[in-house]
Each structure stands twice: as structure tokens, then as C-alpha cells.
Amino acid sequence: MYLSKYIRRCDFMDNMNTMDFNQKIDVSLRASLEATPVERNASDDLSTGSSSDGFWNLIVLYTGSPQTLQNEFPSSSFTFLLGNYAIVKISEDDIPSLAAFPQVIYIERPRQLFFEIVSARQASCLSAIQENSSYGLTGKGILISVIDSGIDYAHPDFCNPDKTTRLVALWDQTILADPSAGRFAPAGYSQGTLFSPEQINAALQADTFEQRMELVPSTDVTGHGTHVAGIAAGNGRASGGLYRGIAPESSLLAVKLGSPDPKGFPNTIELMQAVDFSVRYAIEHTVPLVINLSFGNTYGSHSGTSLLETYLDYVSNLGRINIVVGLSLIHISEP
């Protein structure tokens, strides 16, 4: 049986090498087809698209009528997409004929997709370093302040193994202070409500979502702040440790930015107050601080002389503080 497979493979490769359609087949597919079964099975990348029954799932760009393509290869199954693209499940033996068919422009093997948090950790070699506990690069003893759209404080990644919160403070600038309900703005500030770890833990013990919201009614409507916090400091409890952030043992401080206009975005006043609160907390508790700012705009001269910029320069020199600004600049004027 093995000999017959070997002979068929040699015949297949002879067809691949003698016909002039190689330019229609992408390089990675050709590499997979030229690999031995042992080599292909040993590689997740080379085997992507192939199945144990000798069929391949491939991406095809074609011209003309879809029906013509289907009629030419009746034993293959096609899913026709917009723009003359198609997904085909085809026998490996028929791939040379598919590539030789004039109506076919190009054939490509599918590629695996990964969660970016995993590939980013792999690219930085962070997992290997963190597994060596002697380095201590887990964020332990570090405070990360996420100034954003809020945080899902009940998410398992932001809780300790005993299900208590990792948050040292949650300042929701959108919730009006209500002293009668035990809700106060942070000392020195007039906006929003500051929730302590004790209040958050009480909310986490609530039996229902409604009861939890009565105690700590802070939510992250867009999910952006939760996403950012997960990348920075998620401990992976929700995924059994599979998807962890960069500093899974750090403490967290979250500020949900408010806005003078309920229908608008926060402005730099709310941002500066959030930074100020975070820095003061870190200095008071003598902990190293990392502030993540994923809010911003392209306004100003970019000279570093606006009051916001000079303020950030100033506070970044207080204590052990690192401010990280991450933006996707989608509105860039042309010269």
C-alpha cells in the first residue's frame, strides 16, 4: 500500500514539474504538495487545508461562469464567493488539472489564524521568559492604570484565584456621586464615583447581575477598555491560563472617562484628571505605575508644548511612572 502511494505521488509530482501552470499555484501550496506525508503531518502550517482523505480545501480566483467550473470538476465541491472567488474541496490528484484549466487564474492554500495576543507573546518570547520564575517578569508589584471606556470588573481575568478583585480602585467618571448611597468622588475631584476593592468584592459576591449593578453599576459598553486591560494584565483565568496578558500578576486601577456632553467623547480635562488620580495613588502607595492611554486625537502642533503634553511630561518624571499612549491614526492629512 505504501509503495502504491509512493508511485502515485511520483506521478503527481511529474505532472507538477512538467506542466507550465506552476505560476498559478501559490508558493506555500506548492511546498505542501512537494512535502512528504511525514513532513506535512509534522507541520501545522504545511498541513493547513489538507485532510486525511486526500482532499484539499483551497481558495480559487477564476473567470467566467461558476457553472463551467463546477461542470469541469463534478467530483469537487465549490462555494462561490463574490468577486469571482471560490472555495473548492478537491482531490489532491485533481489539483494539477484545476491549475491547468484556463478559467482558473490562481489557487491559494488557506492560512491558519491566531488570536493576536498569542502571536504577540510568541513574537516577543515573553512566554518563555515568564516561565522562568527567576526573572520575575509577571507584573507582580506593579500597578497598571487603564484610562479608557471602563472595565468589566466581573471578568475572571481581573479576579484573583479566590475570586476577589485585582482592582485597587475603579473611578467611573460617568456615575454621579450619591453620598446617601455611599458613593463619593475621589478626594480632591468633583466628578464621578470612586469604587473601592471592598465595594467591588461585595458586588462580585452578588447572586444576580441586577444585584451586582446595584452595588457597583459601572459597565464597559464598548468593551474597549476591557480589551485593553486584558492585553495588558489579564491573568488568563477565563481561558484556563491560555490567553494571558503581558503582566498577569499586576494590580489594576481603572478609570472610565466621563464627558461633559453625555452624547460626546471625553475631553482632555477628564483625561488629565484620570492621569493625576493614577499618579497620586501610585505615589501614596509607593508602587511603580504604568498608565495606558488609548484615547487621543491628532489636534495641535505636535510640538509637545500643549498643556496636556507638558503635563504628561511633568508627571512622568514623578516616582516610577511609565505612560504608554497607543493610537490608530486613521485621519492623517496629506501634505
Residue ranges and their predicted role:
Residues N132-I269, T286:
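Subtilisin-like serine protease catalytic core
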Residues S97-I107, G136-A154, Y311, N322:
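Hydrophobic or amphipathic alpha-helical targeting/insertion segments
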Residues L82-K89, S294-S301, L312:
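Conserved short loop/turn motifs at secondary-structure junctions
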Residues L271-A282, L293, L308, N317:
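Hydrophobic, small-residue-rich alpha-helical packing segments that form membrane-like cores
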Residues P110, F277-S303, G326:
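Short acidic, glycine-rich surface-loop motifs adjacent to enzyme active sites
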Residues M1-A86, D93-S133:
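Autoinhibitory N-terminal propeptides
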Residues S316-L318, S333:
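Secreted peptidase-domain scaffold signal
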Residues S328-P335:
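Residue-level detector of conserved catalytic or cofactor/ligand-binding positions
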